[in-house]
Amino acid sequence: MKQSSDHLSDVLAICRAERAVTARFFLSAPWALASEGVPGTMIRIGQGQPYWLQVRGQAPVQVMPGDLVLLPLGSPHVMASDLALPPISFSQMIERFAQGPKDENPLTFEHGGSGASSRIDSVLLWISAHCRHTILPLLPPLLHIPAQQASPPAILGHVLQTLIEDSLERRPGWRLAAMRLGELAMVHVLSNYFAAQQEREQGWVRGLADAQIATALAAIHGNPSHDWTLQTLAREAAMSRSRFAEKFKALVGASPMAYLLQQRMAHAAQQLESGLPLVQVAENCGYESERVFARAFKRWCGLPPRAYQRKSQALRKEFAALK
């Protein structure tokens, strides 16, 4: 069977949207809104008057019409016509305008004064646990893609506007379209970002720049539960075990087996979030003992598997309600 040469796609294939929340804001200067953070990946694109966006602890950026912004982990931020203005909490606006869960009733509102207006389209994605634990933490808290740098900008902007309009008009299939089109926009941004970083970053991003290591990385990401050994991974890379282990650690920053363990635990987190019983998750991840798996999982994320499962269920409810 012919192997893929597009290893970045192989790795990013785990980044799937499981739910989507959409919104459209009509904002007239002066205005300022503050978010304390949301449990998801936020994508926004605006039209009309430029506005400012500042992630907590970061320098502000001016967002021009057609620019795309992505907050991979939904970090706390302020967006405003003027950052000197005292912001109103997003949660207050949601309480005021939302009607039921937002994934059932997309949010739209008008806010501000009588000055120049901006329209901001927004989609919030609940991304698969495997991606949230392994891919998204590698990103900066804000990715800002100017309209002239998007490739191609017109199509990407049209995709986002289409998914917002479908959801606001409740067209048949809008929920699935919102998930898939939002996912498409996110993967487009991630692929461009990571492709530009391959020579600078350590970790799997840098590993993808090397054809042999990239093959092994794609194999791990594609099937983390497989009974991989150092020998079988070296064989995937067409290298000797010693040379493979040395080169993998130099590029990725972790040994092949340590990296494999990280991917398995992230894969386990995704299965726990789907509601699978602990014993089944342990077996799927190659553990004969539920107790041994539970210890390994707790070392990885700081929570026992059942506590993680309860927390993820609570976050899903928060994502849907956003109250």
Put a short name on every predicted segment:
Residues 143-154, 167-226, 230-237, 250-258, ...:
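Short, Lys/Arg-enriched, Trp-marked, Pro/Gly-tolerant hinge/linker segments that flank
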Residues 8-14, 76-162, 195-196:
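A hydrophobic/aromatic-rich effector-binding and dimerization subdomain
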Residues 1-68, 74-112:
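Generic protein-terminus/edge-of-domain signal
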Residues 49, 82, 166-169, 192, ...:
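Generic structural signal for alpha-helix termini and adjacent loop/cap motifs
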Residues 17-20, 51, 168, 194, ...:
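Generic structural signal for secondary-structure transition and capping sites
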Residues 18, 42-45, 155, 159, ...:
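Amphipathic, well-ordered alpha-helical segments in soluble domains
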Residues 215-222, 226-234, 239-240, 246-295, ...:
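Terminal helix-turn-helix DNA-binding modules in bacterial transcription factors
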